[in-house]
């Protein structure tokens, strides 16, 4: 959870706070986040958030950011679900597309009872490691997004290819009085298929190269 009402591209402006408690590594969380992808849904019984926040003595800008694990519900040692962790959905974004994924605003600690675990050793003299930790995760997710996109492109191409082999429509351009033929035999359909395949193979090459380096 990165974006806030007052901190979008300027990540260093995050206002969400994390306050140390008597338990080492456990911090009280207070703040608002927005545009959070799959921030809340019914597909899982619990949601574990990675939250960017600053301690009261944090360095200004991105240097003072920390990354914390904040569950929607606490989990017992035996894996069973425990008490609610004061993480509240405060609004759903209405989008032009991507309706299969909920994008919403979240409030942490609205009832002053939200806690999270610091990832790593925590801040030293107000300097946190949250940005490097978050980008390590995000860089891997960017590759995963490319893999997902490649799968979608491939599925669309091969579905279209199969359809062109069974659908008959109109005679060939070179034989206007002849019988209807499979649409894969029409030059413009073949052109569109080749263009789609070129995008598919170029995307595959880009993804493989990115993974390699």
Each language-model region and where it sits:
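Structured core elements
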Residues: 1, 15-19, 26-30, 35, ...
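Glycine- and acidic
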Residues: 1, 30-36, 46, 86-92, ...
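Glycine/proline-enriched, intrinsically flexible loops and inter-domain linkers
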Residues: 1-11, 66, 77, 86-87, ...
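Gly/Pro-rich turn-and-neighbor structural signature
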Residues: 1-27, 32-35, 186-213
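Short Gly/Pro-enriched turn/cap motifs at secondary-structure boundaries
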Residues: 6-9, 40-42, 59, 95-102
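A short core secondary-structure module
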Residues: 26, 30-84
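A glycine-rich, basic-preceded beta-loop-alpha segment at the flavin cofactor/substrate interface
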Residues: 74-90, 95, 105-141, 161-184
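Extended amphipathic alpha-helical segments enriched in small hydrophobics
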Residues: 139-213
């Amino acid at each position: 959870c990165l974006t806030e009402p007052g901190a979008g591209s300027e990540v260093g402006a995050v206002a969400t706070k994390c306050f140390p408690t008597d338990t080492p590594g456990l911090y009280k969380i207070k703040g608002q986040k927005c545009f959070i992808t799959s921030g809340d849904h019914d597909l899982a019984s619990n949601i574990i958030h990675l939250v960017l926040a600053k301690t009261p003595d944090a360095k200004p800008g991105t240097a003072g950011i920390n990354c914390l694990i904040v569950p929607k519900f606490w989990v017992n040692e035996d894996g069973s679900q425990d008490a609610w962790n004061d993480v509240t959905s405060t609004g759903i974004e209405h989008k032009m597309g991507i309706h299969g994924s909920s994008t919403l605003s979240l409030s942490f600690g609205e009832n002053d009872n939200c806690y999270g675990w610091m990832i790593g050793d925590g801040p030293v003299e107000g300097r946190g490691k949250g940005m490097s930790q978050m980008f390590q995760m995000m860089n891997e997710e960017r590759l995963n997004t490319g893999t997902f996109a490649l799968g979608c492109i491939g599925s669309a191409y091969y579905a279209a290819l199969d359809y062109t082999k069974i659908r008959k429509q109109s005679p060939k351009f070179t034989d206007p009085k002849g019988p209807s033929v499979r649409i894969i035999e029409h030059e413009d359909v073949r052109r569109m298929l080749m263009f789609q395949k070129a995008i598919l193979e170029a995307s595959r090459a880009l993804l493989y190269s990115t993974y390699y380096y």
